[in-house]
Amino acid sequence: MEQTGGVGGCLLRADRIERGRRHDLGGQHPHQGAPFRRGRKRGDFANAIGRSRGGRTTKIHALTDAAGRPLALTLTPGQAHDLVGLGDVLARVPTPKVLIADRAYDARKLRDRLTERGCQVVIPPNPTRKHPAPWDRDLYRARNLIERMFCRLKDFRRIATRYDKRADTYLSAVLLAATVIWWLN
């Protein structure tokens, strides 16, 4: 992994993308009951489409280098916790020297696993923790690089509003946009 910029590590963040209109109910009348079937619905989870108050959403999990260029991307449904997509993203790159992430990634197992591998973990502790872990505030300021990467990613209309039904089609568009961002950055 190429180390450039002031921080020699990776940044991590998940971002939600809405799919369709807010009142889109997938062809069902709003007062109609759920269809009779056993087990969980197929299709939506496999296509990384989740439901939340804002409608159907998808999370893009991204890992960037110190220059804000995307290294690894993956999709999960919008209601899934951020740690769900973390394993897939971290498996695609070698262990970074520094990992900067937001509070949603504050988990003891994650900290221990990355510290064992020699990675410095910079994650602000969850305010409900009894024993908060130490973190470097100055190094955490570099997290805005991933926010700017997501801003550049959402400049592409197809990424900002998900028009694709299938997750692999949408992910290919995200990866194509990430390639353009890498090339221009």
Show the residue positions of the predicted features.
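Short alpha-helical elements
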Residues: 1-185
